[in-house]
Amino acid sequence: ETQNPNILFIAIDDLKPTIGSFGDAFAQTPIMDALSKEATIFLNNHTQQAVCGPSRASLMTGKRPDYTKVRDLKTKMRDINPDILTIPEHFKNNGYQTLGVGKIFDPRCVDNKRDLPSWSVPFIKENQLVYSSDYGPPALGYYQNKDIKNKVRQLRAEATSKGVKNLNKYVRDNYKPPFGSANVPDEAYTDGAIAARANLMLQDLSQNQSTPFFLAVGFKRPHLPFTAPQKYWDLYNKNEIELASYQTKSVNGPDLAYHSSGEMRSYKYPEIDYVINEENLLDLEESHQKDLIHGYYACTSFIDAQIGKILQTLKSTGLDKNTIIVIYVSYTHL
């Protein structure tokens, strides 16, 4: 009797088509490029709503936001539709072991178990990841750069002296760099730790292959802030980065299509002066534009490498012979 195939379900947060196989000659993504040669690639996809919570709720249920009623970053999906069926829940109901790690649902839009009905094994959240004592967890969940970590510690101490209860919010309101790097192992950053945990899960799953599995692995980069080990930044020459062709509003472009980049401006950094011009657009110096683009590509290559590690484990355990691999993006930027 043929066993149902396993499913490896990989989510990437905010990835645009900065992949070699999608025609980006600047991108260094050898793992996804190689995989794409054996895969079916979907080139005409459209997000239901370009906001994290609504997009993920829609994708994971196959329902439009008009149905899920998740249109923001606080509505709980099952508060509105308690019996809504998710992709992993469907597999669970049909004999699969379902488990996951990282960011699959937006945590603000599901319960604190990352949607309990979806998983037959407790979902592994970011605060359950393991980091070496050599470097510890990334500050604010993002940063391993020593200077940034020291600044975060200083601000936390300052908040404590002022009697502030939410220390991390105090730090983020005053200091949250949009990019960062450090000469540390991949596993020092959240996404490296996610890949490492996924590999352990695959190794455990390979010990008993009588039950098919649905393993969801959710990576958090290349969403802001653009943080990755230095070696991925070193893959790219900042001087070769091309800026966006259009730096102003298009002729007769509708105002609704433009905004003042509120999320970008929430990343407080003393070296960047966020200026809103007369067109209500964010003006950034060219060097900072290049820093951001550089960081985005570095993070894309970082995630590509983590996917490579997972695929290698899939192969070394023999699970690759009966596993369907899905790589998708929650939603993206143009």
Regions found by a protein language model. Name each.
Residues 1-334:
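Formylglycine-dependent sulfatase
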